[in-house]
Amino acid sequence: MTATSSHGARLTIDLGALAANWRRLAAEAAGAECAAVIKADAYGCGIAQVAPALWDAGCRTFFVAHLSEAERTRAVLSDATIYVLNGFPPGSAPAYRAMGFRPVLGSRSEIAEWAQACRSLGERLPAALHVDTGMNRLGLNPAEAIDLAGDAVLGAFQPTLLMSHLVSAEVPGDAITARQIAEFARVRMAYPALPASLANSAGIFLGKAARHEIVRPGYALYGGNPTPERENPMRPVVRLEAAILQLREVAAGETAGYNARWTAPGPRLLATLSLGYADGYPRAGSGRAEALVGGVRCPFVGTISMDLVILDVTQAPPEAVRRGAPVVLIGDGLTLDEVGQRAGTIGYEILTNLGSRYDRHYIEGSSLSA
């Protein structure tokens, strides 16, 4: 961090590590195409920067959630294949056609609407078929999907992919995962010529039965651990730092933060940092989160507020405790997954909520440590 930081907190995103993670996942899934999920503004890391970095690494197929995200991706990647996971809004088929987007269709009514739109446009436009194998969220049920295989409606457009989504691929030996793999294989028999996709980040590490022709990593690309029961095979991509705004000595019995929820058990040195829940750092981490000051873990005290947090830096090295000194909130061993766990959530939520107020710094070569 620099003293000229306009916010007082910096988010560093390592595009070199991102590309290395994609190559690592592509190698793990050798024989399948490795796509990339870049929904939610590339998991908070920025579509405009992330998508070209992945393209340069060799990725050619991208998945987003909404049409607006597809448009932002197309603005930086003119030749990429772009699937829209949440299907298509009524009346948007001309936009999909003009921009070359492929909706993921998950119901008979949506399929009928897409087919009718293709007839009206006079063109068999591409689309994916989504089968629900256990999530009960989006998708055709397996019986519907098998029945659909013989329906003339498929002749009105060009099916290019059969896909489903794993419920708990990160849980070793999970029975639901085994059932989903088997169910998807059964449905796929009705579509022998259609490329298929089932594996997410964790699914890539389940072996060939889950991979099929296309794998769809998301969280792991950005440094999240796809194998939480084992050491993380991915390189860290994000680093969050904030500068110390103010130092304050408090005596035993004094309180800090809203509602006086923390009381000093003895003399303490407190540091206030310029970030809070408005920046995506979860309020639920109050009293549970930690940050690194001079390499020493220091606890958050009091309630995390909108723009400020307070640390107990009593045990930090004296030379690291000064106004303007950097504090690490993600990085150097404080992982996304740990930050999420301490806040009672998951690393995905931490990553995608990292706010727009940070000074963002993109680097091409990996200099971040786990």
Curated annotation (Swiss-Prot):
It comes from the Bacteria. It catalyses: L-alanine = D-alanine. The keyword Isomerase applies. Its cofactor is pyridoxal 5'-phosphate. The active site is at residues 39, 258. One of its GO terms (cellular component) is cytosol. The modification N6-(pyridoxal phosphate)lysine is found at residue 39. GO terms for molecular function: alanine racemase activity; pyridoxal phosphate binding. Substrate binds at residues 137, 306. Gene3D superfamilies: Alanine racemase (3.20.20.10), Lyase, Ornithine Decarboxylase, Chain A, domain 1 (2.40.37.10). This is Alanine racemase.
